[in-house]
Each structure stands twice: as C-alpha cells, then as structure tokens.
Amino acid sequence: MVLLKEYRVILPVSVDEYQVGQLYSVAEASKNETGGGEGVEVLVNEPYEKDGEKGQYTHKIYHLQSKVPTFVRMLAPEGALNIHEKAWNAYPYCRTVITNEYMKEDFLIKIETWHKPDLGTQENVHKLEPEAWKHVEAVYIDIADRSQVLSKDYKAEEDPAKFKSIKTGRGPLGPNWKQELVNQKDCPYMCAYKLVTVKFKWWGLQNKVENFIHKQERRLFTNFHRQLFCWLDKWVDLTMDDIRRMEEETKRQLDEMRQKDPVKGMTADD
C-alpha cells in the first residue's frame, strides 16, 4: 500500500517571487542541516530538456544518520542511511524523486508540486484518476499558526506572526491573514500543491515508517515555508542569475561544512 497526501501551503508571495525565494531558501536551509559528515551533497545542478519539458535538474545525496528514527538506525547497515534526491524543476511544476540504494524499489518518496496563483481552493490539480484522488488526504499548512510547529523547531526570528518585511511591507500575519489577503489589492498570494507519495516495504515496519515520513515531510514543509517568508527581504530583489551563482558557492560550502562542522539541524522525532 502506498500512502498519498497532498499538502497545500498558502503564501503571501507571487508565483514568480516564489521561484527565487524557494531556491534561495533551499540553499540556506541546506547549510543549516549540514555538518559532522551528515547533510547535503550536491552532485549535479544543470539545465535539462526532455520531451518538450525544460528546467533545472539536480541530483543530491542526503547523508542522514541522526535524521532517521532509532528503530531504523538499529536495523539498517552502514551506508544504507544515504538517500538520493533527483529533482526536475520545470517551474511552476516540479517533480522530486527520493530513493535509497539499499532498499531499491522498496523505498520511494515522490513529491510533485504545482505552484498556482490561488488560495488552495483547487481540487485535483495533479490530474489523478478520480478513484485515486478519492483516497488522497488534503493537508493545509498555515505558516502563521504556531500550533503547527514543534516547540524544538520554533525560532522567533522565523515566525511569520512576528515578521514584518521592510522591503515589501508584508506581515506580520495575523490569525485571519489568508481571508485578509483576498481584500489586499497590493499583496500577491499563491499556493504550493505538494502531492507526496510514500512507499516503504519492510515487513512489520511499513505503516510505522510511512506515517513517520509523512510526519517529517509536513514538519519540513512547515518549517521551510516559515523561513522562506521571514527571509523575504534577503531574496526578494535577487534574480535567477544571482541564484545560480549562489548555488555554486553553496555547493562548495556544503562540501566543506560536511567535513568540518559539527552535526546540526533537524533530527528525527523518535
């Protein structure tokens, strides 16, 4: 059985702004998760064109260890805790496939994202068969809702309910910020529709691990998009050329940090 959920993340930015903001925030967040031999290693980052689709292809390895639950760490041999992430970013559509060489076809996380200029009101944007869509749970993530954030993940400087952008005037986001967006002519909005497929075939552990992965994906999406909004003034003036230069520098920094820095960032919730 494969577990599917669609996470809907509404943001007070435009679809065009988000393209830059997402890439900037991915680079910054990678640094926060890398050190002590763990974290992110960028193997490939290059343009691609296939079957009429154009975009940016990336291949990364995530060295996990402390970022997986203890019960998996105890069972998995050394080297099995590295996962490969391949992403085809044909914005506003993006497809990410995460695999593991040890588990082969028994492990898969697939994240398909459509970025739309709406408030998360569209049904089945990924055009699944009606029978399949019927079994997909839609999960709404509110970046300003403190109750959706684990206490150990909370940082006041990354709280959209407290942040006000100097460059754009957006924020802080109150309890009814999404409803208020509709009446604010000068504030753009968008929704990232993230369809997440999780497959983990390991007798006796399947349900436990699939649910754990979805819990971690939700946590990741929540924390990441809170950061993205609170970093708005750092990226809102950047161009895609700026981003590509920054990605090159980040790749070099990550290689260095993995070797020299201590373990840091999000760890598994045992």
Curated annotation (Swiss-Prot):
Residues 250-270 are annotated as: Disordered. GO terms for cellular component: cytoplasm; cytosol; extracellular exosome; nucleus. It is found in: Cytoplasm; Nucleus. Changing C94 to A/T: No effect on phosphatidylinositol transfer activity. Resistant to inhibition by N-ethylmaleimide. Phosphatidylinositol transfer activity is inhibited by N-ethylmaleimide. The keyword Lipid biosynthesis does not apply. Residues 250-263 have a biased composition (Basic and acidic residues). InterPro entries: PI_transfer, PI_transfer_N, START-like_dom_sf. GO terms for biological process: axonogenesis; lipid metabolic process; phospholipid transport; visual perception. It catalyses: a 1,2-diacyl-sn-glycero-3-phosphocholine(in) = a 1,2-diacyl-sn-glycero-3-phosphocholine(out); a 1,2-diacyl-sn-glycero-3-phospho-(1D-myo-inositol)(in) = a 1,2-diacyl-sn-glycero-3-phospho-(1D-myo-inositol)(out). The modification N6-acetyllysine is found at K215. Changing Y102A: Reduced phosphatidylinositol and phosphatidylcholine transfer activity. CDD domains: SRPBCC_PITPNA-B_like (cd08888). GO terms for molecular function: lipid binding; phosphatidylcholine binding; phosphatidylcholine transfer activity; phosphatidylcholine transporter activity; phosphatidylglycerol binding; phosphatidylinositol binding; phosphatidylinositol transfer activity. A 1,2-diacyl-sn-glycero-3-phospho-(1D-myo-inositol) binds at T58, K60, E85, N89, T96, K194. Catalyzes the transfer of phosphatidylinositol (PI) and phosphatidylcholine (PC) between membranes. Shows a preference for PI and PC containing shorter saturated or monosaturated acyl chains at the sn-1 and sn-2 positions. Preference order for PC is C16:1 > C16:0 > C18:1 > C18:0 > C20:4 and for PI is C16:1 > C16:0 > C18:1 > C18:0 > C20:4 > C20:3. It comes from Homo sapiens. Keywords: Acetylation, Cytoplasm, Lipid transport, Lipid-binding, Nucleus, Transport. Belongs to the PtdIns transfer protein family. PI transfer class I subfamily. It comes from the Eukaryota. Its main location: cytoplasm. This is Phosphatidylinositol transfer protein alpha isoform.
